[in-house]
UniProtKB/Swiss-Prot annotation:
EC number: 2.4.1.227
Enzyme class, first EC level, given as a word: transferase
Similarity annotation: Belongs to the glycosyltransferase 28 family. MurG subfamily.
Organism whose genome encodes this protein: Shewanella frigidimarina (strain NCIMB 400)
The keyword Repeat is annotated on this UniProt entry: no
Keyword tags: Cell cycle, Cell division, Cell inner membrane, Cell membrane, Cell shape, Cell wall biogenesis/degradation, Glycosyltransferase, Membrane, Peptidoglycan synthesis, Transferase
Name this protein carries in UniProt: UDP-N-acetylglucosamine--N-acetylmuramyl-(pentapeptide) pyrophosphoryl-undecaprenol N-acetylglucosamine transferase
Residues annotated as binding UDP-N-acetyl-alpha-D-glucosamine: 18-20, 130, 170, 196, 252, 271-276, 297
Keyword hit for Nucleotide-binding: no
Topology in membrane: Peripheral membrane protein
């Protein structure tokens, strides 16, 4: 074995389930890998990390674990035994890899992995992306050496060793936000993002919104509708005579290009989305997913809304009329558009990736 590889520091990263956990963790992994660290991932085989992590060149190990919230009685009764089994599986991975530090960034594997790390005497560092912590991180915060969070006041005051560091995001988005952007004087460019599965409420109302606004203003729309929704949403735009001004896509592979194109974004308010909007300096109309655990997306949205960088439209009151009204404000006042973008950039934490990586490195050195 190459002596440089064998002596380089090692980190086990636990993150999975959603892009909001996986992509920030990948940003940290890439940063540390460039510094010579050995990276190994702990996840579950049936979630997105199983595909994304190897695509980015990192080794991943799997354990068997599911969520425990909101399940039936029999599953809850079986849960303790399954958790114990998954802790044993995670400890086997740790014993094999011998990491210097463990970073937990959310997802099902983080709980058993964090407990196994504690039992193995390995320093555990947590990062919480949302404004309200998930159940796993709430529990692990009691045993972690350091608890990192994206937003202030995320954890209770009795949780020790908490530090606000922001959400790690891709470097190209940080660089995009550093460029001075002047909203176009012609058509208002509206980016609609509903996540990998799309947001049904946005898919339903946007065609009517565009049909109404196009009577008074020039606008173009890039609408990401989610898997298997493209034909239906495209037909809705066509029926209202709006197909020429709208680009309907199942997915947007290049979000940097989408953010660069857009004047304003209509979207959910997942933690990563909120952090990216701040970093690229774009105003937004935020429609929190109403069924998110502890309604954390509404709290996430408040980071931008309270700064004057976005508007909040709860799904319970959202309709074509009030969404069109908000977009009309942007269409009629490009100066307001620019000011809100500047305010968004003002709440961005641009060195989050380095801060998370440096803190992990500091605990690895302490051993």
């Amino acid at each position: 074995m190459n002596s440089n590889i064998s002596s380089s520091p090692k980190i086990l990263i636990m993150a999975g389930g959603t892009g909001g956990h996986v992509f920030p963790a990948l940003a940290v992994a890439k940063y540390l890998a460039e510094k010579g660290w050995q990276i190994r991932w702990l996840g579950t085989a049936d979630r997105m990390e199983a595909r994304l992590v190897p695509q980015h060149g990192f080794d991943i190990e799997f354990i068997d674990i599911k969520g425990v919230r909101g399940n039936g009685l029999m599953r809850k009764l079986a849960a303790p035994f399954k958790i114990i089994r998954s802790i044993i599986q995670a400890k086997a991975v740790i014993d094999d890899f011998q990491p210097d530090v463990i970073l937990g960034m959310g997802g099902f594997a983080s709980g058993p992995g964090g407990v196994a790390g504690k039992l193995s005497g390995i320093p555990v560092v947590l990062h919480e992306q949302n404004a309200i912590p998930g159940l796993t991180n709430k529990l692990l915060s009691k045993i972690a050496k350091k608890v990192l969070c994206a937003f202030p006041n995320t954890f209770a005051s009795n949780v020790a060793n908490v530090e606000v560091v922001g959400n790690p995001i891709r470097q190209e988005l940080i660089e995009l936000g550093a460029q001075i952007k002047t909203p176009q004087a012609d058509a208002l460019r509206v980016l609609v993002v509903g996540g990998s599965l799309g947001a049904k409420v946005l898919n339903d109302v946007m065609p009517a919104v565009v049909a109404h606004l196009s009577k008074y203003h020039s606008l173009t729309v890039w609408h990401q509708v989610g898997k298997n929704n493209q034909a239906t949403v495209k037909a809705s735009y066509q029926q209202l005579g709006q197909s020429d001004s709208v680009n309907v896509a199942e997915f947007i592979d290049d979000m940097e290009a989408a953010y660069r194109w857009a004047d304003v974004v209509v979207c959910r308010s997942g933690a990563l989305t909120v952090s990216e909007l701040a970093a690229v300096g774009l105003p937004s109309i935020l429609v929190p997913y109403p069924h998110a655990v502890d309604d954390h997306q509404t709290v996430n949205a408040s980071v931008l809304v309270d700064a004057g960088a976005g508007f909040l439209l709860p799904q319970t009151i959202l309709n074509a009329d009030n969404l069109a009204e908000k977009l009309q404000l942007f269409a009629e006042n490009r100066q307001e558009l620019a000011q809100m973008g500047h305010k968004a950039r003002g709440v961005a934490v641009l060195d989050a990736t380095q801060r998370v990586a440096d803190i992990c490195a500091s605990f690895a050195r302490k051993g």
